[in-house]
A protein has these predicted regions:
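Membrane-water interface at transmembrane helix exits
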Residues: 25-29, 55-59, 132, 136, ...
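Transmembrane alpha-helical segments and their boundary/interface "anchor" motifs
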Residues: 10-14, 27-87, 246-250, 256, ...
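Aromatic-enriched alpha-helical transmembrane segments of multi-pass intramembrane proteins
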Residues: 78-218, 251, 257-279
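Alpha-helical transmembrane segments and their membrane-interface exit regions
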Residues: 43-45, 152-153, 176-183, 221-231, ...
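Short, intrinsically disordered terminal tails adjacent to the first/last structured region
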Residues: 301-311
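Hydrophobic cores of alpha-helical transmembrane segments in multi-pass inner/ER membrane proteins
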Residues: 14-22, 51, 176-180, 221-222, ...
Length: 311
């Protein structure tokens, strides 16, 4: 958190949606629509439900001005839990929970601001499933979806970042569609270093001269995918550590809020980051090894019919 209404993590959200669009589109090429949705549900919901339960029943009572008993009695934790599972955005702010003085920052009452993106991610999955069902999960349609999303930003007043910071699907969905389109592109053409360098240079120029443009960072999508899949780049594997990415994403914000509370007047973005990172990675590791990897084994009972989708 940088303060002054700037959230550094938004760049991580961009990368998250680009990567997700790429990988989920790859996953959608085989199997039935039901199988696709089942695999997505297994990836999203087990860790999400546990995170919400910990937020509502641990962080909520500890950081409510009402105290533990009155919080549990007056804040309807069960209703909050159910609504947050059905719509993760609802769990961003818990009733009667405050981590520090709101006069310091407008983020003081946000228990887990990252959950807004989970709702949008689920919506993107449903769109992909619908396209699978009607046979339109193809490159031209994803290009059209991307073009419409970016054009909307150019010609219509967009709420980001002045009015609605974290609730507009039309803001983030184009990043997912961009990742999806890149999967079709990479299926037909090998990743190209020159092209990746050009896009990276354009991305830097856009950030420097058009910093307010919401889709400038999208220019880094091709370089990001190039680094991830190019055979000439050998990235270190994290097999021993496990896939801690999702758990780290879920717990990063709550941990930062707790650290902000603990530091008080000594809270700066670099101290918050430095203290939060190892704690968040530990929680991500626990989430993967105790819950997520076991839940993913259930995908074996899913719908295994091979139904390739034409590009």
């Amino acid at each position: 958190l940088l303060g002054d209404d700037k959230i550094l993590g938004i760049f991580g959200v961009y990368a998250f949606f680009i990567t997700s669009g790429f990988l989920v589109t790859q996953s959608a090429q085989f199997g039935s629509v039901g199988g696709f949705l089942w695999r997505r549900a297994l990836r999203i919901y087990p860790a999400l439900v546990v995170c919400i339960l910990l937020s509502v029943y641990v962080l909520g009572p500890l950081f409510s001005p009402l105290g533990i008993r009155r919080y549990l009695r007056w804040s309807n934790p069960l209703e909050t839990t159910v609504l947050s599972v059905l719509n993760p955005s609802y769990g961003m702010k818990l009733p009667n929970v405050q981590f520090y003085d709101p006069a310091i920052s407008w983020l003081a009452t946000f228990t887990n601001g990252s959950l807004w993106s989970i709702s949008q991610e689920i919506f993107c999955y449903l769109i992909l499933a619908a396209l699978m069902a009607i046979g339109l999960l193809r490159a031209p349609f994803m290009a059209l979806a991307l073009a419409v999303g970016v054009t909307w930003q150019l010609f219509f007043e967009h709420p980001w970042p002045d009015t609605q910071l974290i609730t507009d699907f039309t803001f983030i969905a184009p990043y997912f569609f961009c990742g999806s389109l890149l999967w079709f592109v990479m299926e037909k053409w090998q990743p190209n270093l020159v092209l990746a360098s050009i896009f990276a240079a354009l991305g830097v120029l856009c950030l420097v001269f058009l910093p307010a443009y919401s889709y400038g960072p999208m220019l880094f999508a091709y370089p990001l995918v190039y680094i991830a899949i190019s055979p000439s780049i050998q990235l270190p594997t994290l097999d021993r550590l496990g896939d801690v990415s999702y758990g780290t994403y879920l717990y990063g914000w709550p941990v930062e809020q707790v650290v902000n509370h603990a530091l008080g007047q000594y809270s700066t973005w670099w101290t918050v980051f430095g203290l939060s990172l190892p704690i968040t990675l530990l929680l991500g590791w626990l989430s993967w090894h105790l819950l997520e990897k076991h839940a993913l084994r259930l995908k074996r009972i899913s719908f295994l019919q091979r139904q390739p989708v034409s590009p």
